[in-house]
Amino acid sequence: MMGVVSTPKVVGRQVYGSLYECDNEVLKDVKRLEEIVKEAAKVGNMTLLDIKSWKIGEGVSVVAIVLESHITIHTWPEYNFATVDVYSCGAHTDPYKAFMYIVNELKAKRYTINEADRSSEF
């Protein structure tokens, strides 16, 4: 129906970006990155279900499954660089707050941020 605005039945919001000039030591520290992701889930009002991490060369990948979707961090310490993706379903969550918490904890001097509304109308 044209002109009718309906409320999405599924609220999906994704915040993702690239972080530059990050703290090199944090980017290498698996345990610290896991702690950051756990706290980001709390800050974003998400329910952490599981977290896995892998050391890949000097870098680290952390993948957290939250009840509402996921949080990921991938790091490249040799470039002081990381990528972050926070995707959540549910109006009660705040992926932007979770993303910004990670930006601050990695001490990024600059970053890009992208936001996508992935809500659906059935």
From Swiss-Prot:
It is an enzyme of class 4 (lyase). One of its GO terms (biological process) is spermidine biosynthetic process. Its cofactor is pyruvate. Is synthesized initially as an inactive proenzyme. Formation of the active enzyme involves a self-maturation process in which the active site pyruvoyl group is generated from an internal serine residue via an autocatalytic post-translational modification. Two non-identical subunits are generated from the proenzyme in this reaction, and the pyruvate is formed at the N-terminus of the alpha chain, which is derived from the carboxyl end of the proenzyme. InterPro entries: AdoMetDC_fam_prok (IPR003826), S-AdoMet_deCO2ase_core (IPR016067), S-AdoMet_deCOase_pro-enz (IPR017716). It catalyses: S-adenosyl-L-methionine + H(+) = S-adenosyl 3-(methylsulfanyl)propylamine + CO2. The active site is at S69 (schiff-base intermediate with substrate), H74 (proton acceptor), C89 (proton donor). Binds 1 pyruvoyl group covalently per subunit. Its EC number is 4.1.1.50. The keyword Translocase does not apply. GO terms for molecular function: adenosylmethionine decarboxylase activity. Disulfide bonds: none annotated. Pfam families: AdoMet_dc. Pathway: Amine and polyamine biosynthesis; S-adenosylmethioninamine biosynthesis; S-adenosylmethioninamine from S-adenosyl-L-methionine: step 1/1. The record marks E68, S69 as: Cleavage (non-hydrolytic). The keyword Signal does not apply. One of its GO terms (cellular component) is cytosol. Keywords: Autocatalytic cleavage, Decarboxylase, Lyase, Polyamine biosynthesis, Pyruvate, S-adenosyl-L-methionine, Schiff base, Spermidine biosynthesis, Zymogen. The modification Pyruvic acid (Ser) is found at S69. Belongs to the prokaryotic AdoMetDC family. Type 1 subfamily. Catalyzes the decarboxylation of S-adenosylmethionine to S-adenosylmethioninamine (dcAdoMet), the propylamine donor required for the synthesis of the polyamines spermine and spermidine from the diamine putrescine. Heterotetramer of two alpha and two beta chains arranged as a dimer of alpha/beta heterodimers. NCBIfam families: SAM_DCase_Bsu. PANTHER family: S-ADENOSYLMETHIONINE DECARBOXYLASE PROENZYME. This is S-adenosylmethionine decarboxylase proenzyme.
